[in-house]
Design a protein with these regions (language model features):
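Non-heme Fe(II) oxygenase catalytic core, chiefly the N-lobe of the double-stranded beta-helix
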Residues: 2-253, 259-291
């Protein structure tokens, strides 16, 4: 029997009773989409998945992206699955160790934006019995609704420039060992403009579509006014009332929609506290006629 339990907070729900390693029926897929629209973040506990099963489940919701910036961290034979891990084998990291440690929404820098992330917690570090490496979210439905009416009016119809290199270099400036992007990688991910407000395809409601990780400029404003407005928006969208933290357990699949949330990874574990998470990125091309 499938059971849905709300977190009781602004975001988050748990769906139990679905085996994601089996083909997902249309009825179950529709249930997941409904809960995803209502709650933004969905946890499926006690799963046992291969990388291919993770990709097959994720593909039921849209086209899967293949990451071009971290090709050496792809799952062998399943390039749509990216490995996020601090484990080192034979002197080499098996995955990207410091992914997502600043507030962002995935693929906002892409002409086709992301619809959802699907992550599988194969190995989760614990200390004194407490799971580490939580993922924190903020609701962009709530952020939009909480904006002053005059600012909503002034920003309506405007667009924001998103740049992948902003996030990448921000991580390097904070000590990440990731190398600078190559010219080919930069060409593959050029800056892209997106509407500052989007109509969410699952809810039909407006969301604030900007984030501290990738957003660099409001195109229609002078530079100083753009900087000041973005600084206000970044602070506003991190209002504690809009936020929710999901704590991992081994075997969890965590799925969230990228249009109405921003998120960050909490890196509260050390290099010897091993974490292994496998990720699929579902693109929003299937939903674009409704955005």
């Amino acid at each position: 029997m499938v059971q849905v339990t709300s977190s009781g907070q602004i975001l988050g729900a748990t769906i139990e009773g679905l085996d994601l390693g089996r083909p997902l029926a249309a009825e179950a897929r529709d249930l997941v989409l409904r809960v995803l629209g209502e709650r933004g973040v969905v946890r499926f506990p006690r799963q046992e998945l291969t990388a291919r099963q993770l990709a097959e489940f994720s593909a039921r919701f849209g086209t899967l992206e293949t990451n071009v910036a971290s090709t050496h961290y792809q799952e062998p034979g399943v390039p749509q699955v990216m490995i996020l891990s601090n484990i080192v084998e034979n002197g080499k990291p098996i995955g990207l160790a410091d992914a997502g440690q600043d507030w962002h929404t995935d693929m906002s820098y892409s002409r086709t934006i992301a619809f959802a992330n699907v992550l599988y917690g194969a190995r989760i570090p614990r200390r004194d019995g407490v799971a580490l490496g939580a993922t924190e979210f903020s609701s962009m439905h709530a952020a939009y609704e909480g904006l002053p009416a005059d600012l909503k009016r002034d920003l309506a119809g405007k667009s924001v420039l998103h740049d992948f290199n902003k996030f990448w270099e921000g991580m390097r400036n904070r000590g990440s060992r990731r190398p600078p992007l190559t010219e080919a990688q930069r060409k593959a991910k050029p800056p892209v403009s997106q509407p500052i407000f989007l109509t969410h395809p699952l809810t039909g409601r407006k969301v604030l579509y900007a984030n501290p990780g990738y957003s660099v400029r409001i195109n229609e404003l002078p530079e100083r006014e753009s900087d000041e407005t973005l600084a206000f928006l970044f602070e506003h969208q991190l209002n504690p009332a809009y936020r929710y933290t999901s704590h991992w357990e081994e075997g969890d699949v965590l799925m969230w929609e990228d249009i109405g949330t921003i998120h960050r990874a909490i890196a509260d574990y050390g290099p010897d506290e091993h974490r292994l998470v496998k990720r699929c990125q579902v693109m929003a091309d299937r939903y674009f006629d409704r955005i």
